[in-house]
Each structure stands twice: as C-alpha cells, then as structure tokens.
Amino acid sequence: MPKRILQGVVTSDANAQTVTVSVERRFTHPVLKKTIRKSKKYRAHDEKNAFKVGDTVRIIECAPKSKTKRWEVLEA
C-alpha cells in the first residue's frame, strides 16, 4: 500500500524536531450541496527544525517516531 502524502500549513513549531501541520480538506455536503471545509492536525517529524509557523509543507506517512508522530515532513 502506498504511503499517503498530505499538504498543509505549519501551525506550531514549539517542540524540538516536531511541527504541527494543519491539513484542510473540502467536500460538498450530500444534502445541502454546500462546500464544507474541515481541518485536521498532524504532528510530523522535522529532523533539522527547518520549518516555521506559516510554512506550507508536504508530509508523508512513516513508521511511528513517538506516541503521536506518524508523519515526516517531506518538503516545503
């Protein structure tokens, strides 16, 4: 099974080698036919502490790095 790749915005870089990335998805409500925006936060491994709040990054699934980290920052 291929690894998922998501794109989002860094919302926190407070922890060492970890960034929090907010990923937004849009879909049309089946009944209301209205476009709805939902977001989810992922904690991703940032080896070099290179990314700051507001950066747009791509993250990829990986083996668990810690209790909450299952993603790595792929590129900006």
Curated annotation (Swiss-Prot):
Write the record's keywords in alphabetical order, separated by commas. Answer: Ribonucleoprotein, Ribosomal protein, RNA-binding, rRNA-binding
One GO BP annotation of this record: translation
Tell me one GO molecular function of this protein: rRNA binding
Task: Give an example GO cellular component term for this record.
Answer: cytosolic small ribosomal subunit
- UniProt key word rRNA-binding: yes
Under the subunit heading, UniProt states:
Part of the 30S ribosomal subunit.
Its job: One of the primary rRNA binding proteins, it binds specifically to the 5'-end of 16S ribosomal RNA.
Q: Which family does it belong to?
A: Belongs to the universal ribosomal protein uS17 family.
Identification of the protein by name: Small ribosomal subunit protein uS17
Traced from the root, the source organism's taxonomic lineage reads:
Bacteria, Pseudomonadati, Pseudomonadota, Alphaproteobacteria, Rhodobacterales
The UniProt gene name for this protein comes to rpsQ
